[in-house]
């Protein structure tokens, strides 16, 4: 990624919370996993920054969704049931984020958001962790929409999502995964028109075919992503 020209790289910590790691019986290693992941990314980012000091590279701590949500029931016969509480989730996120901050991340990226309540738990945990560690870094959010109507899996529109998180000190809001780059454009336009933050995007390479592979070529995706820049759909919101 850095050789290709990236300014920001993510840590390899997408599912590195005790909630998600419990499925693999390694939840006791969450702190160690996050510390190691940040240090690895930090080392290589600093290496590239040293080569070109006028182009600093940054490390964003990847905070992904968990395998349990606060808004949806895993039991179709009991829609009121929740697999965990907000406080339990916030505590798990805080454990992850404190390790990231101690290891030296430049930003926190709460990504692939499909449940706004989960995201709010992560935002709360981030604020608590930054206060405890005594370090403040930019807070980045990235949502994934699950249908062509632009709603998240938990049913919120992008406008409703923005309203739900407007209390937070946010650096950027964006979209990731979801559909291909071209299909994501109208939703980026919605964000840019409403959000008083920087806008980001990193879509999938289209949707997989029946064999589970992707037909879109790197060159095709690059052309579509280039349109985001030329048409002002990423960067500072309008």
Give a label for each model feature.
Residues 2-236:
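Domain-level signal for soluble alpha/beta catalytic cores
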């Amino acid at each position: 990624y850095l050789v290709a020209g990236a300014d920001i790289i993510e840590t390899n910590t997408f599912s590195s919370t005790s909630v998600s790691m419990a499925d693999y019986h390694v939840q006791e290693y969450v702190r160690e996993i996050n510390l190691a992941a940040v240090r690895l990314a930090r080392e290589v980012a600093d290496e590239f920054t040293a080569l070109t000091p006028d182009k600093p590279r940054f490390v964003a701590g990847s905070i992904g969704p968990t395998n349990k949500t606060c808004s949806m029931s895993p039991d179709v016969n009991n829609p009121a049931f929740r697999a965990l509480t907000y406080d339990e989730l916030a505590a798990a996120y805080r454990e992850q984020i404190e390790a990231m901050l101690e290891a030296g991340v430049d930003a926190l990226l709460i990504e692939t958001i499909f449940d706004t309540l989960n995201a709010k738990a992560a935002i709360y945990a981030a604020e608590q962790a930054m206060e405890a560690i005594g370090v403040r870094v930019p807070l980045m959010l990235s949502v994934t929409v699950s249908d062509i109507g632009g709603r998240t899996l938990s049913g919120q529109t992008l406008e409703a999502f923005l309203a739900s998180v407007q209390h937070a000190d946010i650096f950027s809001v964006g979209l990731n995964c979801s559909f291909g780059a071209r299909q994501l454009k109208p939703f980026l336009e919605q964000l840019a028109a409403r959000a008083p933050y920087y806008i980001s995007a990193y879509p999938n390479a289209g949707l997989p075919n029946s064999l589970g592979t992707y037909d879109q070529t790197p060159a095709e995706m690059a052309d579509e992503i280039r349109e985001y820049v030329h048409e002002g759909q990423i960067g500072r919101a309008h």
